[in-house]
Every structure is written in structure tokens, then in C-alpha cells.
Amino acid sequence: MIINEELKTAIKMMAQDNNSKSQNDMIDILMKSKLLIPVKISPAAKRDDQGNYILSPKHKITFATVKNYQDTKNPDWSYFIGFTDSEELKAWANGKKVDAFMADFNDYAVMLLKPDAVCKGFVLNPAGGNVCFPTDVVKQIIKRRDGK
């Protein structure tokens, strides 16, 4: 089970006082956090006794995305989604059952920095805190992390 109270608190603190310190504090916590990324598995996958998916080459994984319709310049841009915990995931899913994988910041970065990447970033808790990380911001975070 994923519980990210420290990250959720940092997101709230940033929303209340959005400055470079609150942003950096939230990013530092994000870098250590595990997130839930909603997926569609086709055909449906079974689970083992520990709740892990049993996948084979026949399974196709599709990551859920959202569009930022408020972005009038780029309304067709899609973003991956991430959730701090199952409560945030359930709020977004409106009671529907949703499969999810565990991911971290680096997993999102790998998907976003592929040469053929379609998504332009990822959104954390779109039904709650709604923190957007465009690909350019992801690149800056990686440079900061790597000391470049």
C-alpha cells in the first residue's frame, strides 16, 4: 500500500505559499516517493497471492493520460497521471475499478524523455492537488538531481 502523507503535506504547503523553497521541498520529497500510475491491461491480468499482476507477452499495457484543456495554446497535449495514494486514485476514478502500477519520478522521466514520447509531462493528483510537471520541468529536476 502506498501512503505519501509527507508528499501530500508538501503539496498543500506549496499550494498555500508557492515559492521556490516550497517547490523544492515538494520536489525533494517527490524524488523519494512511490506513486500510483493508472493503467489499462488488455486482456485483463490475473494476480498472484501478493496482489502482483501476472503478465505475459500477450498483455498490452496502456497508461492513462489527461489533457489540459485550459492550455489554449496546446489543448491536444496529453499528460501521464500519478497519484500519491489509493484515495486520490479512487477520487479521480469516480468509483470505477482502476488498475495501477507503482512508479517513481524516474519511471515518469524515462517515459517522457524517449525520442518518440507523445505525452508532454505528468500530473500528480489531478482530482486533488493537481501539480503539473511538464517535460521541461522534469528535465530541470533531473539536472538539479544530477548536479549538472
Regions found by a protein language model. Give the residues of each.
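An interfacial alpha-helical scaffold signature
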Residues: M1-K148
